[in-house]
Amino acid sequence: MASEPHLRSHGADRVRQEWNTIGENELGIDRDVAEEIVDALNDELSGLYILFNQVRKHYWLLEGAEREDLGGFLEAAADRLAETTDALAVRVHALGGVPVCGPMGIRQHAPLHIEAPHHYDVRSSLERDLDGYATLAALFRDHVEHVERVGDTATGELLRERLVVLEEDAHVLERYLAEDTLVRREALD
């Protein structure tokens, strides 16, 4: 017997639009251009999903002296990542696309590697988070230029606004990672 995929289908008769297709949009954006933009936004969405889950994991596993202060930041940062994800997913839909969701779509568009499921020290975890923020910030910058070049200034503005949020959170992570900010393991031994 063949293995069934881990997807739950409601039946083909209930599908309004298939994943990876572009329908009409009311924004006046040509379908081919909308397809390019949706593909780019799905890259961002995939990275946001991965980084959100990674930041939440690091929040859950915090312990020690940094728990309260750093925990508050990571929890709020995850919320901001979720808000950015929602804003971009709504834009994908407005452009006539279906936002990336689920492991297969995320893997297809992933600009980040998924962190192994281990519990790492705080410094290593934050370095990994900062790397994810840097990767996404670079992707957002590239896509701002691209979408504005093809005439979608509204998506460009959305990406610019959300880029500022990513950069602000990355700056906070940089401060936590400053030489003497975090307790080092050898100091506890």
Range-by-range predicted roles:
Residues 156-188:
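Short, contiguous alpha-helical
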Residues 16-24, 30-64, 126-149:
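Alpha-helical bundle segments that constitute or directly flank the non-heme di-iron/ferroxidase center
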Residues 2-3, 99, 103-107, 134-135, ...:
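Long, contiguous binding/interaction regions
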Residues 42, 46-49, 75-86, 127, ...:
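Generic structural signal for well-ordered, non-transmembrane alpha-helical segments
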Residues 1-27, 185, 189:
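Haloarchaeal acidic low-complexity proteome signature biased toward cell-envelope/secretome components but also
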Residues 40-41, 58, 90-91, 104-164:
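Acidic/histidine-rich alpha-helical segments that form the ligand environment
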Residues 56, 62-105, 176:
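Conserved alpha-helical segments that form or flank metal/cofactor-binding pockets of metalloenzymes
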Residues 53, 68, 72, 153-157:
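Short, solvent-exposed positions on alpha-helices
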